[in-house]
From Swiss-Prot:
Entry's family note: Belongs to the somatotropin/prolactin family.
The species this protein was found in: Acipenser gueldenstaedtii (Russian sturgeon)
Gene3D superfamilies from the UniProt entry: 1.20.1250.10
UniProt protein name: Somatotropin-1
Keywords, sorted A to Z: Disulfide bond, Hormone, Secreted
Subcellular location: Secreted
Superkingdom, taxonomy of origin: Eukaryota
Length: 190
C-alpha cells in the first residue's frame, strides 16, 4: 500500500467530519420539523433524554479547550465519540421511512465507519497504536426507537439526534484544531 501523506489523512478526516456534522444537523432539523411540535421542542431540550454520554468524558468542549490538548488525546476522544455511535446508527434507517433521514441514514453509517478508519490511520501514523480510547467512553448510545407513535420514543430519538449532532461537531472541531496546528495554511479558520 502506498503511504498516504499525513496532510492528506487530516484533510480527508476533516472533510468526513464536516460532512457528518452537516448530515447530523440536517437529520435533526428534518426530524424536528416532521415529528416535534413547536411547544415540545423547547421542553425536550431540558429533558433527561437530551443528556449525552459524551458529557461524561473529560473531552474539551470547544476549540479553545481543544487547543490545550495533545493530538493523541484529541484523536482518542474523536475515536471514542465515533465508536459510541456505530451501533445506534445501524438501526437509523429502520426508524425513519419516507423522509430525508431515511434517504441519508445508510450513508451516515458508512461515513462514520470511514471516519473511524481515518482516525485509526492517523493514530497509527502518529505512533499511537495503543488505541487507549476504549477506556474513555465504554458506553454506547441506545438504539433509536422504532415506535414513533409514542411520545417517549419521539423524545428519546430527538435527544439521540441532538447528541449525535453535538458529538459530530466536537469531532469536527478536534480534527480541525489538529490539522491547523500541524499544517499552517492561510485559510485555516476554526
Amino acid at each position: 500500500y502506498p503511504m498516504i501523506p499525513l496532510s492528506s489523512l487530516f484533510t480527508n478526516a476533516v472533510l468526513r467530519a464536516q460532512y457528518l456534522h452537516q448530515l447530523a444537523a440536517d437529520i435533526y432539523k428534518d426530524f424536528e420539523r416532521t415529528y416535534m411540535p413547536n411547544e415540545q421542542r423547547h421542553s425536550s431540550k431540558n429533558s433527561p433524554s437530551a443528556f449525552c454520554y459524551s458529557e461524561t468524558i473529560p473531552a474539551p468542549t470547544g476549540k479553545d479547550e481543544a487547543q490545550q490538548r495533545s493530538d493523541v488525546e484529541l484523536l482518542q476522544f474523536s475515536l471514542a465519540l465515533i465508536q459510541s455511535w456505530i451501533s445506534p446508527l445501524q438501526s437509523l434507517s429502520r426508524v425513519f421511512t419516507n423522509s430525508l433521514v431515511f434517504l441519508t441514514s445508510d450513508r451516515v453509517f458508512e461515513k462514520l465507519k470511514d471516519l473511524e478508519e481515518g482516525i485509526v490511520a492517523l493514530m497509527r501514523d502518529l505512533g499511537e497504536g495503543g488505541f487507549g480510547s476504549s477506556t474513555l467512553l465504554k458506553l454506547t448510545y441506545d438504539k433509536f426507537d422504532v415506535n414513533l407513535r409514542n411520545d417517549d420514543a419521539l423524545f428519546k430519538n430527538y435527544g439521540l439526534l441532538s447528541c449525535f449532532k453535538k458529538d459530530m461537531h466536537k469531532v469536527e472541531t478536534y480534527l480541525k484544531v489538529m490539522k491547523c496546528r500541524r499544517f499552517v495554511e492561510s485559510n485555516c479558520t476554526l
